[in-house]
A protein has these predicted regions:
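DUTPase catalytic domain/fold
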Residues: 1-143
């Protein structure tokens, strides 16, 4: 699928690293190091603006290697870029470790995944259909 993109400051375009990759890594569009102290949250720009077709979204997701090795995640867990958003994509980075982490210019800090979405049309009813599970949740099926 073609998605229109504007690169800012010669930012490298994201690309799929393997034929089976679902996500494309995005890079920090910063001119100098950004140090994240433990527990710190900062918005890191990635230097891309996109025009996503209606009926789709792009999810911004943490990179598993950064999370495992350095405790770097995203404060909002997963970010959604809506099809009508035209601003620069940013990553809401959070340092969940007990050590400072330095984000370098051009470092791969998150990944983008394109998803098809549908909008909900609510149908108000008096009762919902029954299931074996019912309202059981929050640990209902095990630990």
């Amino acid at each position: 699928m073609q998605v229109k993109v504007i690169r800012m400051n010669e930012t490298e375009l994201p690309k799929y690293e393997t034929i089976g990759s679902a996500g494309m890594d995005v890079r920090a569009n910063i001119t100098e190091d950004v140090v994240l102290a433990p527990g710190t949250i900062k918005l890191i720009p990635v230097g891309l603006k996109v025009e996503i077709p209606v009926g789709y979204e792009i999810q911004v997701r943490p990179r598993s290697g950064l999370a495992l090795k350095h405790g770097l995640g995203m404060a909002n867990s997963i970010g959604t870029i809506d099809s009508d958003y035209r601003g620069e994509i940013g990553v809401i980075a959070i340092n969940l470790s007990d050590k400072a982490y330095t984000i370098k210019p051009g470092e791969r800090i998150a990944q983008l995944v394109l998803n098809k979405v549908e909008q909900i049309e609510w149908v108000e009813v008096e009762a919902l259909g029954t299931t074996e599970r019912g309202a059981g949740g929050y640990g209902h099926t095990g630990k």
